């Protein structure tokens, strides 16, 4: 079995060097000195009985307890250029540029046009702090020499042999030679980031050359180059831990910006737009995995586009299962390549055109489960799409294709598909509103390869005449067709007294051609009519006030509503191979045809919905706040398209958010009749009773659903702050139906003053076998990107 431990130890070299930083400078005197009552030195020099006719430059003032004149003035030489003036005790130097300096002694030399400050020197300007034993102020340039000073600005402090300030693209940049950087603001810091040269971009990043991480008197990590941003997406990240199927592991990520041009003086990439995150992960049970993620930072992050992710691992044990499901024929060569991008290529005053890509190539069906379980839980079968899109204020048009790059899960293809949606808008300058949806495409759906192979093997083993053979044949039949679908709807909002009435009428057609399998081509015509009626009542409650519960007067709003929806269409035969079809859910279906995405499952329906919304609104933060909302409704089926019901459940959707430390969400549905209906309760509550304790509890009950499994699940999360240093977090998930504690997770947090650390441990019961994991978190408080993250939930 291959064990690439050598690569691991080459990455993290531990050095035993005892080279200490220079002895820390003595703490400066308090920075709260008040301006003394004495006259500034310029007033003294204007006194003709004691000084020549010279003055400090305009905008410079020096104060001190004692003034002494030295140099040629005391020898009878009245040359102003030889004058030396000493200030002793509680020195304060001010300039009109905002610079302030404090020291024990100031020596002004008019010959050299300098002021020598010494003894507990502190310089302040633009939020920056310099500290040291001496510094020289130039009277002509009104600037200080910062050699052998310590520089401090949030969140770092810098000690260096020399520091110089330059301006790059309008920003102040500091270049320090033989530098030591820390965020631990004490006389004897617990750690230093050392380098031969450090370039500091305040509020952005630090670039190190010949970097050492030093804790105490030990060099812990050396790198020839490190660009360490204050942004958590960049810089170095390390995550050690362990998990049953992965073994012990250390995940390493290093993020840097690419693109742009390098500045020769600062080493910064100007105009860099491509964020790259490089991964090198070592697993004792899997081997070495390496990859890179690229993010286009020019795109809006909210769009969810703009990255390329590549990862590969030569798996030492690819058939080790995680959830107790046997694996066979899984090759060691495991990888993932994901490209998600939107490339705008044309923009007009009314429209924007772009090329969109969303592609994911996986080596096998278990890759996401092993190496990206957080994505696996929400999207275990990623789509693959390429297309051109046109967006305008009133419409969305797309010509694209859905590909089948991964044959190990069931998916459909669209080669190609054209869609055009008109949003609801006025029709020809009339009160009528119009909306429509049109799509045309060639569609196919295929089973996963392992499913086809399994069914084919089962069919080959059957005896002649076995009824199971026909069932398998139907499952193995190719499913596909060419489909044209269009639907158009008009609506007319009407105000009738106290009532809001919105009638809607729509019609459409769906045509299937080139149908694969036993079915013939077919056309379907859809006719739909709807009417929505609602009204509102409200009552002002000015005396309903409570500081404890966040109420400053209230208004109670009641909104009764009803909706009648009718659809008539040609039904498809039950054997027809539907592609855009319904999936099981416990929530009510969408009953507006234009928003009904399961086009192939459109069926006749007649449904009346009756409901009432209640809102209790109060004043908060110069605005209005929904203190309590409740929506209660049910459906009466004149014709039920799915389950032949007379009535749906009675639904209640409740949200209560009275104060920031309390939130309650509750969704319930109970049978109105006793015929084939189910019960569901889904609730969650977050409560922070005091500053040191917070918990969140959720409960879900599902019973007698026709498709979904019964469930009684409790989820509990807590965080307790024991004191200024210790905190404990927990997460438990319990399934009461089979009395299974599905997840136990425990996190311990400790504040090390300059560092923060956490350790987490979890046990997951997969019913067939247990899974264990552990991870650690260690980071510098003020530099979140230089840390070890804890991501128990993602594992």
Q: Residue locations for each model-derived region?
A:
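Bacterial N-terminal signal peptides
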Residues: 4-13
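Bacterial Sec-dependent signal peptides at the C-terminal "C-region" and cleavage site
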Residues: 14-20
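Structural signature for solvent-exposed beta-strand/loop edge elements and short helix-capping sites
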Residues: 20-384, 484-488, 516, 705, ...
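Outer-membrane beta-barrel translocator/pore domains, especially the C-terminal barrels
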Residues: 136, 143-145, 158, 169, ...
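Structured loops at beta-to-helix junctions and adjacent beta-edge loops in soluble globular domains
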Residues: 179, 211, 257, 281, ...
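Short helix/loop capping segments that flank catalytic or ligand/cofactor-binding pockets
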Residues: 184, 209, 216-218, 223, ...
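Recognizes the extracellular SEMA beta-propeller fold with strongest preference
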Residues: 334-363, 382-403, 408-416, 420, ...
């Amino acid at each position: 079995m291959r064990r690439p431990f050598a690569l691991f130890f080459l990455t993290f070299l531990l050095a035993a060097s005892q080279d200490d930083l220079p002895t820390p400078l003595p703490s400066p005197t308090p920075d709260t000195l008040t301006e003394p009552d004495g006259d500034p030195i310029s007033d003294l020099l204007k006194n003709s009985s004691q000084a020549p006719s010279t003055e400090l430059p305009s905008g410079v003032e020096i104060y001190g307890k004692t003034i002494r004149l030295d140099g040629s003035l005391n020898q009878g030489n009245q040359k102003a250029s030889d004058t030396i003036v000493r200030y002793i005790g509680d020195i304060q130097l001010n300039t009109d540029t905002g610079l302030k300096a404090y020291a024990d002694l100031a020596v002004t030399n008019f010959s050299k046009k300098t002021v020598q400050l010494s003894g507990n020197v502190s310089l302040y300007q633009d939020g920056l702090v310099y500290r040291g034993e001496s510094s020289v102020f130039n009277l002509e340039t009104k600037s200080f020499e910062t050699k052998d000073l310590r520089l401090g600005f949030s969140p770092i402090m810098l000690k260096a042999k020399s520091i110089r300030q330059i301006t790059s693209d309008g920003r102040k940049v500091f270049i320090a030679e033989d530098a030591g950087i820390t965020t631990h603001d004490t006389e004897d810091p617990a750690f230093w980031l050392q380098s031969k040269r450090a370039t500091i971009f305040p509020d952005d990043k630090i670039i190190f050359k010949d970097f050492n991480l030093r804790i105490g008197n030990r060099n812990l990590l050396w790198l020839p180059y490190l660009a360490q941003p204050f942004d958590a997406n960049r810089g170095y990240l390390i995550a050690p831990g362990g998990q049953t199927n992965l073994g012990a592991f250390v995940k390493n990520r290093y993020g840097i910006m690419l693109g742009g041009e390098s500045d020769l003086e600062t080493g910064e990439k100007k105009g860099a737009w491509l964020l790259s995150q490089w991964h090198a992960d070592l697993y004792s049970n899997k081997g070495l995995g390496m990859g890179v993620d690229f993010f286009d930072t020019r795109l809006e992050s909210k769009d969810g586009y703009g990255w390329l992710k590549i990862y590969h691992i030569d798996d030492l044990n690819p058939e080790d299962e995680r959830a107790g499901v046997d694996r066979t024929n899984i090759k060691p060569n495991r990888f993932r390549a994901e490209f998600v991008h939107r490339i705008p290529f044309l923009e007009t005053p009314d429209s924007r055109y772009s090329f969109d890509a969303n592609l994911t190539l996986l080596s096998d069906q278990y890759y996401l489960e092993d190496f990206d379980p957080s994505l696996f839980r929400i999207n275990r079968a990623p789509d693959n799409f390429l297309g051109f899109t046109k967006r305008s204020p009133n419409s969305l048009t797309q010509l694209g294709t859905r590909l089948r790059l991964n044959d190990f899960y069931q998916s459909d293809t669209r080669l190609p598909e054209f869609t055009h949606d008109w949003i609801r808008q006025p029709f020809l300058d009339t009160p009528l509103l119009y909306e429509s949806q049109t799509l045309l495409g060639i569609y196919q759906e295929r089973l996963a390869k392992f499913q086809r192979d399994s069914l084919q093997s089962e069919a080959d083993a059957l005896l002649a005449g076995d009824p199971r053979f026909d069932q398998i044949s139907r499952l193995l039949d190719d499913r596909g067709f060419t489909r044209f679908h269009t639907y158009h709807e008009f609506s007319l909002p009407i105000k009738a007294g106290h009532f809001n009435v919105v009638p809607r009428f729509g019609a459409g057609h769906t045509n299937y051609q080139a149908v694969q399998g036993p079915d013939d081509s077919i056309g379907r015509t859809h006719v739909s009519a709807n009417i929505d009626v609602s009204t509102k009542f409200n009552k002002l409650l000015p005396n309903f006030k409570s500081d404890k519960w966040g109420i400053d007067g209230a208004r109670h709003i009641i909104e009764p509503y009803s909706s009648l929806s009718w659809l008539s269409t040609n039904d498809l035969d039950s054997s027809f191979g539907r592609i855009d079809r319904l999936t099981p859910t416990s929530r009510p279906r969408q009953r507006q045809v234009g928003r009904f995405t399961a086009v192939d499952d459109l069926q006749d329906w007649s449904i009346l919905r009756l409901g009432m919304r209640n809102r209790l609104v109060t004043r908060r933060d110069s605005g209005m706040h929904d203190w309590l909302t409740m929506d209660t409704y049910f459906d009466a089926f004149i014709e039920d398209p799915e389950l032949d019901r007379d009535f749906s459940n009675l639904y209640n959707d409740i949200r209560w958010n009275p104060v920031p430390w309390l939130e309650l969400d509750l969704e319930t549905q109970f049978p109105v009749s006793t015929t084939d209906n189910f019960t569901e309760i889904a609730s969650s509550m977050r409560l922070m009773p005091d500053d040191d304790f917070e918990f969140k509890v959720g409960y879900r009950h599902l019973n007698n659903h026709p498709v979904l499994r019964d469930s009684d699940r409790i989820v509990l999360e807590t965080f307790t702050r024991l004191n200024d240093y210790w905190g404990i977090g927990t997460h438990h998930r319990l399934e009461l139906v089979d009395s299974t504690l599905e997840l136990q997770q425990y996190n311990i947090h400790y504040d090390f003053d300059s560092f923060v650390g956490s350790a987490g441990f979890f046990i997951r019961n997969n019913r067939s076998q247990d899974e264990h994991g552990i991870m650690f978190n260690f980071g510098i408080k003020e530099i979140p990107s230089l840390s070890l993250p804890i991501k128990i939930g993602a594992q």
